[in-house]
From Swiss-Prot:
GO BP annotation list: cytoplasmic translation; regulation of translation; ribosomal small subunit assembly; translation
HAMAP family to which the protein is assigned, alphabetical: Ribosomal_uS15_B
Assembly and oligomerization: Part of the 30S ribosomal subunit. Forms a bridge to the 50S subunit in the 70S ribosome, contacting the 23S rRNA.
Gene: rpsO
Protein name: Small ribosomal subunit protein uS15
């Protein structure tokens, strides 16, 4: 249930500083958000898939930690990122 290579490259080019910037906080949060959105559609059909639900909770927790880190380090980048992603934080 991972993202395709093209989708990942598109997210990296959109949120990264350059085409190879896969490690910045913004890119990591954007990739996690895309994976979370993909899994939410999966759970609409497969309600009893508890194994994948545990992975979803892990991704949500990781995204929350990265957003907290970004908010601590640079509030302007944090607010810009949550507006671009449409998160309700």
């Amino acid at each position: 249930m991972s993202l395709s290579t093209e989708a990942t490259a598109k997210i990296v080019s959109e949120f990264g500083r350059d085409a190879n910037d896969t490690g910045s906080t913004e890119v990591q949060v954007a990739l996690l958000t895309a994976q979370i959105n993909h899994l939410q559609g999966h759970f609409a059909e497969h309600k009893k898939d508890h194994h994948s639900r545990r992975g979803l909770l892990r991704m949500v927790s990781q995204r929350r930690k990265l957003l907290d880190y970004l908010k601590r380090k640079d509030v302007a980048r944090y607010t810009q990122l949550i507006e671009r992603l449409g998160l309700r934080r």
